[in-house]
Amino acid sequence: MAASTGLSTVLKEIVQVCREVESHLATESHLDSGEGAPGKNTFPIGLEGPRKQLANAAAQLSQLVTDPREYLEQLSANHGSIAYTDLANRASVPESQLKSVLRMTAAHGFLAEVTPLEISHSPTSALIATNPSFYDWARWLTNYSVPSAYHFADATQKWGRTEVKNETAFNIAMNVEVPFFGYLKENAKMNSMFSSYMRNVASSEATSFKHMISGFDWGGLTPGSKVIDVGGSGGHGSRALASAFPGLNFVVQDLPDTIENAKAALNTDESKLHADRVRFMSHDFFTPQPVVDGDIYFLRMIIHDWPDETAITILAHLRDALKKPGARIVIMDTILPQPGTVSLLQERQLRVRDLTMMQVFNAKEREYDTWKALVEKVGLRIIHVEQPEGSNMGLLELGLADATDLKAGGNARLVFNGNMKTPSVNLNINGASTINEFAHGSTPETFAVNGIHTTDKARPNGDTTHSGQASIPNGVSARISTRPMYARDVLPVLIIGAGISGLCLAQYLHKHAIPFVVFERDPSSEHRPQGYRLKLEADAAAALRESLTAEVYSAFEASCAESAIGETDFDPISGACIKSRAGGGLAGAQGLRASYTVDRTVFRRILMTGISDKIYFGREITRYDICEDNVQSYVVATFKDGATAEGRFLVGADGTRSAIRKQLVPEHKFLDTGATCIYGKTVMTPELLARYPARALRWMTVVADRAPLIQSILIGESPLTLLSEPIRFSRDEPTASLPEDYVYWVLIGRRELFTDATNTSASSTGHGVNSDKAYNTESAQASAAQSLALTEEWHPSLRSLFELQDVSQASTMRVVSAPPKLPVWPSNSCVTLLGDAVHAMSPCGGVGANVALRDAAELGKVFASTAASNEEDAIQSVGGKASDQHDMAQQIASFEGELRKRAFGGIMRSFVGSKAMFGQRTFEELDVAEL
């Protein structure tokens, strides 16, 4: 009966996914007809998720219907050649035997019989035939891996349990006395084949560098931090990290021959990239570590090659090098899952890797508990573990066992970002990953999925759950396990978006010990250019003072740029100064008051201080559901990859394209102002200081180009305006990580002035680059080129600002705005909006960030007050009773009422600036922006 039920479930899943795939292919016409060049990828990238789901279900189906007596037959060699009569003659083998072999391989998809007389390549065989690295990979498996596997039983019988390097199945298979690496060094042909094999392994999805880049918070390290890449071979991993994180420096360590080869490779253009930040050092990791001022000691695919005794020696030398405060060890290696906790296909790959390590090295892949026991023997402890989705390796962050924990709470956290299943599941969509309940109380270790703690101990009075049903889009039925009757405020506040407002709210909650988690769709904090300034007025500074701890607020103040208030206007053609005024009324009761100038990248990093372990990147929300049981209401957020998170409240701080706004207030549409802007920054190099007007480097500078254009006949006068400001930092604070002094600038005008070459699909807001827009080098280069084209007739002194710009920081955006009068929607006790998600505004008023920060502080007060009112009775927490939920809904309604007032003032102030800078029409005349 159980097998029948399993078969039925898998078949239904296959049918459902097949319909989804066929529907997509029918509209997109992506799937190849089967004709044409062999080896062509038949699935588009957009179907990668469904393809993997279908492949996994198919593997499960095969396993369910395979008779045990047939299993070994399926494991017979999937190898062969590519033809029939002619091939038999060329290979000097009997045709009948050849045909039997090839038809067996065709039955397994390795080749394809196009007619009863002809055999051709399949995509798999074509890949081996045309890709030298893949060919060497296949040869390696055939010549070395398979023979070693064949003799595994012989080695076990001969030596039993052993960790000696030359007592392996490999030694029996090759009939050699030396260990694997010794034999490899002596055999040039094998060495070359092994190198190709490793290149092929490294190029696979499961071992891609992208998992290394996203699996650890490299962006949270202080700029200038030193990463020691222990056993880093040719430095390819360090260069990948250097490209993604320009503020970090790397030291690649390996044996002398390897380092010399790596240095020789630096003659290539590709290897010269980041040469100033990636240096090489000869070092044997079995000897004491010579670098003792490193911030991170990184070992990728190193420890799994060695048995425990040897691994302890390696780790002990690194432990002794942890001299710098906060220094850590990061290991990227396989963390074997418990059976059945990952997809069948991924588990198969990991089990094969485990056996290979035993057969060749007498080493092993380790489970989490084995890793924990290993590092504890060295006086280390696991601080954090991350398992990136799609990766065969996880990342273990280690610190000294007797050191103060680097993460809040002091507990190791095991985080899985793949299709993991756990014993305590609250919401599971067809096996997709589930973000489980937020654990409360203190336990020695808490395990989590996607960063939300879960443990059976988090359930008071035992597990008394019962199940309910929730409706999820596109017909998928999700099982929801409702929780036992315990305080709702042990669940976290879910903050969607790691922009300014979302992080400020997170800091407020952190300050008041209210559980929260932040989810950000960007894959990292440095995914897009954000290196330009924000102007914060007194009200915003007050909001920060209310939200941040004293230490973090002091760091904010120390990071502020030196502000000078005034305005200078230049003529774009002659380069002459038209007018200039210090103060300009900005310091009085009108205009900008008591402003702070901050670099947005630095500011955002400060707002992540102390909470980076609660921020999860690469999580894009698609919808939410408000659920109820007999005790309380709670919200379940569903992400693009199928993962879910459960919380006490959901805050949409996810920018102008907010999925939360579209669901909560679908009638609330943003407006297209008709303008486009290019943001940029130009570092104050000696050349810029020599060419750019000195009077333009004192305070805010405005250049208005009102040259008549043919468009003026059609659309009225259409000025192009440059707004720039010098950003200088005080170097009195040696601990502050600040960028070089630079000039912030923005070019803004009616869209008709900008060419189609510009990427204008994103939206700009009142406080900088819109976080909804993905960044890439090509779009940055196009933006920089557009700035030069628009200012081609300008005076050379002014144009030097664009000629010397940091091209990587240029970005072009469409300017959108919410209407000044926001709609009134029914408030509830589970969901609300913040910042650009609800009241995007033109940057011309310079107040978007101010309004967003005040939003965050005011919402934080709501959570703090409700937490305080329920402190005496933890069981009857916020929302725990109907009366509590009603009270929370009333407080949210009051918050949203004040938010509408703030939004009206900010949007109207921005309108005044927009009208002056690019001639914005009235809001009634604007079209709805398609976002």
Swiss-Prot record:
This is Dual O-methyltransferase/FAD-dependent monooxygenase elcB. The active site is at residue 304. Residues 464-931 are annotated as: FAD-dependent monooxygenase. FAD binds at residues 520, 604, 836, 849. Residues 462-474 have a biased composition (Polar residues). GO terms for biological process: methylation; secondary metabolite biosynthetic process. The gene is elcB. InterPro entries: COMT-like (IPR016461), FAD-bd (IPR002938), FAD/NAD-bd_sf (IPR036188), O_MeTrfase_dom (IPR001077), SAM-dependent_MTases_sf (IPR029063). Its EC number is 2.1.1.-, 1.-.-.-. Residues 455-474 are annotated as: Disordered. One of its GO terms (molecular function) is FAD binding. It comes from the Eukaryota. Induction: Expression is up-regulated during the late stage of P.nodorum wheat leaf infection and is controlled by the cluster specific transporter elcR. In the C-terminal section; belongs to the paxM FAD-dependent monooxygenase family. In the N-terminal section; belongs to the class I-like SAM-binding methyltransferase superfamily. Cation-independent O-methyltransferase family. COMT subfamily.
